[in-house]
């Protein structure tokens, strides 16, 4: 491990809960539905996080607990059965239904695993009913995806086929591109998880090599390992270098000839570096402060430092899985300040004291920081944007240079007009 | 359990946050798990505020539940008071904290602070956002005024005359995340100033606890948003004898009535000419102008919060000459008033939380304009019907940069523009009517009605979505069938009435037991309904 300084902080936090993952998961698998068993707050949260109300019929909803549900648990189970039946009658196209646990459902101990089991036998294979927790008392923001994928793992068929499995939700175009590159390297059996249709689960077994595409899949990685799969240690595929090392980890494991790897990746790398150039000019030497939110903070900081020359003031992360992050931590410069957990007020004090040029933060904090004169970038944008892979490196850098560019644009205009 | 896809209102503690964030010098310690902090973005993103809401969340975790959560709450209260030095502290809990019963309000009160501490009990599993806001405002006002001398029998709203000063009133109810509150306050202030009435306190928006304490220095109260301020106004009336206005000045007629009411309350004479010309708003003339002829009898469907739908139905009916074909609200607290208003129009009010039920009702009543919330805007878009947004829940679109009140004279102007523009503008629609056989105006013509180009539900019914399947399957089996010739005749009808003609023709065919609709049936039906 590098000489990064690791600090733990506790206090008031300003981080989304795991329910928010539904916002991208429901788009990934159009035949799945996410039913939060929770409160009006949960419903309001997902609605607000989804931001614009653009969906005719969203593929998520909330079974809102009411006073009479709190009276007795048996009642709550009957109610849940009724809601699920109504929902499935209304939406016959649903193939997988996730019952998503929330803070209130966990505090009053509604056993969603048992509910899923019971409903599964009732629907007898027509719909698969799974459960996981997205509650704020158990999970942060992106951990919801970890929970959903983990719930899928027992359903994955076994296979002894030698194959590569990409784990974590990616934009379709990015995923296609990565698969194309692996095929050029002669790795033919490449599958991804979660699948684009919830019913088409990839297989898993002792000959499955797993590359994680997202850093927040700790539990999923563990249960995949339990099914015999091998998790290939690598940095995450963000930026040119991260993506190269990530692809090479697979290549090595599949015994791909190094010269083929070099000849395949070299042109992509050259092109990507060329595309990165204008953004590097913008970003280099600028001070970066990352507040904890998506778990992508460490790989992003690594890319922005290594390849774009940014100075790292602080990397906040909601929690740190040292094993999984080791390849990333190894690439960070000595004495990088990593803060696990959060005390949002103290952290904002440090932002003010350190005067970064760019702050990566959650949506609730962005405008107040802008009002104080800081340029900001929303963490949530990273989980929606196609940023993975060598070809996307310049797009990723652009996301961070845009706020700085905008800042300059508006300030220049103000100067000329006065 | 209630299945919700989209909701009109958040939980009650969001209402409390609206009050806290609207005010100065107030801090809210909210016992809530991680994730509930999402609420900050309602203020910083939707309202585009440059400050975080003054809220400290305890963000407890599962592992805290085994330990001493009460100590955790106290720690956060202590830190919040030290850091933010509020003049008054609100303490409450969100839905999950309610279940673990730490009673943070009592904990806070036991900590020996000098500042007023308002403990909020907002039952998250039975109440909603507006109720939470009203209750918070009421508790806050009550808490801050509890030591003020009560004088309900002595209060005389005309006392300003003998004291040789201008009358003064409080504006109660405007808050953040309320529909156009910021501009409504300015507009109402302007109108009152014009009539020589001073503003004592505006609350909660922009008020500090010190302002609340001098709330009873006013002669009367103006209840601008009953959803938020009615309970407070009633309490002030009972305890201090302050009368309050019941009319909400949205629309020309209501603004006039409002002025009448406040003049009467304060024992003032309303200037004569004001009463006669009735209006300083352009709405009246614009609505009378020949170009507005096309608005005659336009069928309009109204849904939103209580205050805005009541105002909208009056304006639509009395000031724009529309026909109201549907009226409803999600504000259960206002259900009775909305039911009464609907009854007067010969309608049954739709009181519901379910946006799909509203969408069904819109489809059923086949309006030409929908006045609703952002949810209805999306429903209307799917149905190809023009829509204007008149009510919360808030969307970034509802916080415009420009001055855009709903209340008063300028509010009436804004409403005229906002409602009429989504319909085609007068002359343009006349021309389309006159020249509808010209090739320019065939079905490909792009209108103002968005991507559907005014094709109404015709195209929509072909879309292979669940939503459409549901529509079709809900039709009874014996429903009359349109012959190709009937369909082609129907296609000649201008799109903006086509939906209505289709519906009427089917109704007529059903009545006379006709199974197939051709061109003749269509004409028969037209004659039947015109007769």
UniProtKB/Swiss-Prot annotation, chain A:
Keywords: 4Fe-4S, ATP-binding, Chlorophyll biosynthesis, Iron, Iron-sulfur, Metal-binding, Nucleotide-binding, Oxidoreductase, Photosynthesis
Enzyme Commission numbers on file: 1.3.7.7
Cofactor requirement: [4Fe-4S] cluster
Coiled coil residues, start to end: none
Cofactor binding mode and count: Binds 1 [4Fe-4S] cluster per heterodimer. The cluster is bound at the heterodimer interface by residues from both subunits.
Catalytic activity: chlorophyllide a + oxidized 2[4Fe-4S]-[ferredoxin] + 2 ADP + 2 phosphate = protochlorophyllide a + reduced 2[4Fe-4S]-[ferredoxin] + 2 ATP + 2 H2O
GO process annotations (BP): light-independent chlorophyll biosynthetic process; photosynthesis, dark reaction
Annotated Pfam families: Oxidored_nitro (PF00148)
Gene3D superfamilies attached to this UniProt entry: Nitrogenase molybdenum iron protein domain
Record: residues binding [4Fe-4S] cluster: 17, 42, 103
Pathway terms, separated by semicolons: Porphyrin-containing compound metabolism; chlorophyll biosynthesis (light-independent)
Molecular function terms, GO-annotated: 4 iron, 4 sulfur cluster binding; ATP binding; metal ion binding; oxidoreductase activity, acting on iron-sulfur proteins as donors; oxidoreductase activity, acting on the CH-CH group of donors, iron-sulfur protein as acceptor
Oligomeric form and interacting partners: Protochlorophyllide reductase is composed of three subunits; ChlL, ChlN and ChlB. Forms a heterotetramer of two ChlB and two ChlN subunits.
Family: Belongs to the BchN/ChlN family.
Function comment: Component of the dark-operative protochlorophyllide reductase (DPOR) that uses Mg-ATP and reduced ferredoxin to reduce ring D of protochlorophyllide (Pchlide) to form chlorophyllide a (Chlide). This reaction is light-independent. The NB-protein (ChlN-ChlB) is the catalytic component of the complex.
Alphabetical list of HAMAP family matching this protein: ChlN_BchN
Protein name listed in UniProt: Light-independent protochlorophyllide reductase subunit N
Organism: Prochlorococcus marinus (strain MIT 9211)
Gene name as annotated: chlN
Curated annotation (Swiss-Prot), chain B:
Catalytic reactions of this protein: chlorophyllide a + oxidized 2[4Fe-4S]-[ferredoxin] + 2 ADP + 2 phosphate = protochlorophyllide a + reduced 2[4Fe-4S]-[ferredoxin] + 2 ATP + 2 H2O
Enzyme class: oxidoreductase
Metabolic or biological pathway, per its Swiss-Prot or TrEMBL entry: Porphyrin-containing compound metabolism; chlorophyll biosynthesis (light-independent)
Keywords (A to Z) from UniProt: 4Fe-4S, ATP-binding, Chlorophyll biosynthesis, Iron, Iron-sulfur, Metal-binding, Nucleotide-binding, Oxidoreductase, Photosynthesis
HAMAP family, sorted: ChlB_BchB (MF_00353)
Phosphoprotein found in the keyword field: no
Family the UniProt entry places it in: Belongs to the ChlB/BchB/BchZ family.
Name of this chain's protein: Light-independent protochlorophyllide reductase subunit B
Binding site for [4Fe-4S] cluster: 36
Cofactor binding note from Swiss-Prot or TrEMBL: Binds 1 [4Fe-4S] cluster per heterodimer. The cluster is bound at the heterodimer interface by residues from both subunits.
Catalytic residues of the enzyme: 291
Cofactor(s), by name: [4Fe-4S] cluster
EC number(s) reported in the record: 1.3.7.7
GO BP terms: light-independent chlorophyll biosynthetic process; photosynthesis, dark reaction
Record: residues binding substrate: 426-427
One Gene Ontology MF term: metal ion binding
Gene from which this protein is expressed: chlB
UniProt superkingdom: Bacteria
């Amino acid at each position: 491990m590098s000489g990064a300084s690791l600090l733990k902080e506790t206090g008031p936090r300003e981080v989304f809960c795991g329910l928010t993952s539904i916002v991208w998961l429901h788009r990934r698998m159009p035949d799945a539905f996410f039913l939060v068993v929770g409160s009006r707050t949960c419903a309001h949260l997902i609605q607000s996080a989804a931001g614009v109300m653009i969906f005719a019929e969203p593929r998520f909803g909330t079974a809102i607990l009411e006073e009479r549900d709190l009276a007795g648990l048996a009642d709550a189970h009957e109610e849940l059965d009724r809601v699920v039946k109504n929902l499935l009658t209304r939406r016959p196209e649903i193939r997988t239904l996730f019952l998503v646990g929330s803070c209130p459902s966990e505090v009053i101990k509604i056993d969603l695993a048992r509910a899923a089991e019971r409903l599964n036998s009732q629907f007898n294979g027509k719909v698969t009913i799974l459960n996981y927790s997205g509650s704020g008392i158990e999970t942060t923001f992106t951990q919801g995806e970890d929970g959903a994928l983990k719930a899928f793992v027992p359903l994955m068929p076994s296979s002894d086929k030698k194959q590569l499995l990409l784990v974590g939700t990616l934009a379709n175009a990015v995923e296609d591109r990565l698969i194309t590159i692996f095929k050029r390297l002669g790795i033919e059996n490449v599958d991804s998880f979660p699948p684009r249709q919830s019913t088409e689960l990839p297989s898993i077994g002792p000959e499955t090599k797993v590359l994680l595409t997202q850093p927040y899949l700790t539990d999923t990685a563990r249960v995949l390992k339990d099914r015999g799969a091998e998790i290939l240690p690598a940095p995450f595929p963000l930026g040119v270098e991260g993506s190269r090392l990530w692809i090479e980890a697979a290549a090595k494991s599949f015994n791909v000839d190094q010269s083929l790897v070099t000849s395949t990746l070299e042109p992509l790398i050259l092109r990507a570096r060329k595309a990165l150039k204008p953004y590097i000019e913008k970003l280099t030497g600028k001070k970066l402060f990352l507040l904890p939110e998506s778990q992508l903070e460490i790989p992003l900081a690594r890319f922005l430092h290594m390849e774009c020359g940014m100075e790292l003031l602080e990397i906040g992360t909601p929690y740190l899985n040292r094993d999984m992050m080791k390849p990333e931590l190894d690439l960070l410069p000595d004495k990088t300040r990593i803060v696990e957990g959060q005390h949002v007020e103290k952290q904002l004090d440090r932002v003010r004291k350190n005067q970064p040029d760019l702050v990566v933060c959650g949506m609730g904090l962005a405008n107040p920081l802008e009002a104080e004169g800081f340029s900001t970038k929303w963490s949530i944008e990273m989980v929606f944007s196609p940023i993975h892979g060598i070809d996307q490196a310049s797009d990723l850098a652009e996301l961070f240079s845009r706020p700085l560019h905008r800042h300059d644009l508006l300030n220049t205009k103000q100067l000329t007009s006065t | 359990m209630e299945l919700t896809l989209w909701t009109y209102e958040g939980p009650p503690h969001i209402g409390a946050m609206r009050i806290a964030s609207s005010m100065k010098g107030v801090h809210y310690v909210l016992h809530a798990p991680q994730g509930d902090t999402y609420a900050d973005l309602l203020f910083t993103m939707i309202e585009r505020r440059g400050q975080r809401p003054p809220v400290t969340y305890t963000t407890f975790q599962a592992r805290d539940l085994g330990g001493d959560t009460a100590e955790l709450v106290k720690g956060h209260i202590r830190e919040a008071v030290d850091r933010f030095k509020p003049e008054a502290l609100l303490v409450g809990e969100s839905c999950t904290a309610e279940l673990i019963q730490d009673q943070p309000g009592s904990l806070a009160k036991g900590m020996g602070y000098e500042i007023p501490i308002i403990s909020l009990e907002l039952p998250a599993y039975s109440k909603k956002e507006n109720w939470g806001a009203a209750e918070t405002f009421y508790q806050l006002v009550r808490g801050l005024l509890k030591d003020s001398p009560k004088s309900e029998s002595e209060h005389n709203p005309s006392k300003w005359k003998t004291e040789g000063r201008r009358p003064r009133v409080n504006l109660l109810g405007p808050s953040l995340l309320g529909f156009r509150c910021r501009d409504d306050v300015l507009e109402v202030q302007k109108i009152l100033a014009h009539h020589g009435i001073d503003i004592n306190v505006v609350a909660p928006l922009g008020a500090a606890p010190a302002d609340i304490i001098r709330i009873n220095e006013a002669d009367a109260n103006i209840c601008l948003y009953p959803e938020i301020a009615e309970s407070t106004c009633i309490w002030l009336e009972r305890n201090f004898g302050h009368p309050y206005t019941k009319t909400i000045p949205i629309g020309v007629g209501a603004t006039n009535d409002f002025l009448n009411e406040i003049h009467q309350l304060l024992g003032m004479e309303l200037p004569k000419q004001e009463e006669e010309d009735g209006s300083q708003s352009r709405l009246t003339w614009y609505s009378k102008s020949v170009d507005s002829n096309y608005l005659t009898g336009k069928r309009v469907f109204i849904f939103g919060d209580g205050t805005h739908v009541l105002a909208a139905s009056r304006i639509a009916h009395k000031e724009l000459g529309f026909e109201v074909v549907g009226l409803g609200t999600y504000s259960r607290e206002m259900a009775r008033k909305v039911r009464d208003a609907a009854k007067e129009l010969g309608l049954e009010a739709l009181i519901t939380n379910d946006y799909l039920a509203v969408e069904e009702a819109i489809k059923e009543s086949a309006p030409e304009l929908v006045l609703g919330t952002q949810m209805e805007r999306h429903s209307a878009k799917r149905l190809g019907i023009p829509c204007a947004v008149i009510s919360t829940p808030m969307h970034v679109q509802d916080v415009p940069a420009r001055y855009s009140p709903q209340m008063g004279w300028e509010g009436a102007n804004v409403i005229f523009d906002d409602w009429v523009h989504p319909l085609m503008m007068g002359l343009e629609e006349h021309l389309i009517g006159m020249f509808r056989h010209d090739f320019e105006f065939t079905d490909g013509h792009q209108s103002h009605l968005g991507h559907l180009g005014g094709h109404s539900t015709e195209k929509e019914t072909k879309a292979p979505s669940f939503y459409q399947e549901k529509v079709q399957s809900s039709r009874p089996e014996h429903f009359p069938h349109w012959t190709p010739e009937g369909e082609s005749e129907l296609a000649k009808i201008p799109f903006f009435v086509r939906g209505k003609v289709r519906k009427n023709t089917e109704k007529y065919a059903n009545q006379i037991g006709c199974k197939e609709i051709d061109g003749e049936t269509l004409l028969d039906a037209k004659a039947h309904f015109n007769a």
